[in-house]
Design a protein with these regions (language model features):
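C-terminal interaction segments
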Residues: 227-281
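Non-cleavable N-terminal signal-anchor transmembrane helices
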Residues: 1-39
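Short, helix-capping/interhelical loops that line the mouth of catalytic, cofactor-
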Residues: 1-11, 60-116
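A glycine-rich beta-turn/hairpin centered on an aromatic-Pro dipeptide
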Residues: 167-211
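Short, contiguous alpha-helical
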Residues: 36-77, 128-184, 246
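Contiguous mid-protein beta-loop-alpha structural module that forms a pocket-lining wall or clamp
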Residues: 87-161
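Acidic/His-leaning functional-site neighborhoods
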Residues: 197-238
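Helix-loop segments that flank and shape redox-cofactor active sites
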Residues: 24-45, 113-132
Length: 281
């Protein structure tokens, strides 16, 4: 994959700092009416996206949960979603510029706290997802903040940061999930699927459907520039799409019918894989 995704704790801190600053910069340059623009994340506006980032980082910083009632919302369908929505609901009546200023105050505190983790990178941290080591926790935060940064960018029509560490890490997470997603896509045993991202983040990976314990299993074939000898034979379908299209689909933000991609091989196979490719809750 090029550029390579961050993996070391120091690299992940830098990736977090980069996407967190991008969210701040976007917020600071929003006109008042732009805060109310809808985003590709169901039910959330531009301001809501920033509120969500603040809410999660605030919770990790020890802030108490907001005392608000979320109520019935069609995009909230589980307890975790309810937890996320409380932070957004608590700020719905707050003017957009004030929400941005809250992030401007919290963000440097979080960066400083993450730098402190370098002293003990093996420690276990309590997070909403359970106990995680610092690198695992930072990786989760990078892809979450970067994903919501992209939600904001699309709403504002300011596409960018698609060659960033956050973009590379999100791309990696989607491709890492491919074996399980292909296995669940209902494809015939023996089917091979290749996904190529054409840029700005460039990557290529392949999965073959095999039988394991009587069930379909996605066997990863390679990661790199070419299939091993003999593994390109048979029912092979290649899906090519940009970093933007892959990550928007992986985030569940764009329906397959609205996705731009190219297929070599079976179109129906490609559609089944893309339908199953969402990795977000």
């Amino acid at each position: 994959m090029h550029p390579a995704p961050p993996s070391e704790l120091s690299e992940l801190i830098e990736a977090y700092s980069q996407t967190g600053q991008a969210v701040l910069d976007l917020g600071l340059t929003c006109r008042d009416d732009e805060f109310d623009l809808p985003t590709q994340c169901p039910g959330w506006t531009v301001k809501d996206q920033i509120s969500h980032v603040i809410g999660v980082e605030g919770a990790l910083n020890g802030a108490p949960a907001p005392d608000v009632t979320v109520g019935d919302k069609p995009w909230v369908n589980n307890e975790f979603g309810q937890f996320m929505e409380t932070h957004v609901e608590a700020r719905r009546a707050v003017p957009g510029p004030d929400v941005v200023q809250e992030w401007a105050q919290l963000f440097p505190e979080r960066v400083a706290m993450y730098h402190q983790l370098l002293a003990d990178p093996e420690q276990e941290l309590n997070t909403p997802l359970g106990q995680l080591d610092p690198a695992s926790m930072l990786g989760t935060r990078v892809i979450d903040v970067w994903c919501h940064e992209q939600d904001i960018r699309h709403a504002l029509n300011r596409i960018g940061n698609l060659d960033s560490p956050g973009a590379a890490l999100f791309t990696l997470r989607v491709l890492e999930a491919l074996p399980k997603r292909v296995a669940k896509a209902g494809l015939p045993i023996g089917t091979t699927v290749i996904i190529e991202t054409t840029g700005p983040v460039q990557a290529r990976t392949g999965v073959r459907v095999v039988e394991q314990d009587g069930k379909p299993f996605g066997e990863e074939l390679f990661s790199g520039d070419s299939l091993p000898d003999g593994e390109g034979d048979g029912a092979t379908t290649t899906i090519r799409l940009t970093t933007e299209e892959l990550t928007r689909r992986g985030a569940g933000r764009v329906a397959v019918d609205d996705l731009r991609f190219q297929v070599d091989g079976d179109e129906d196979t490609a559609l089944q894989v893309l339908e199953a490719l969402v990795i977000t809750p």
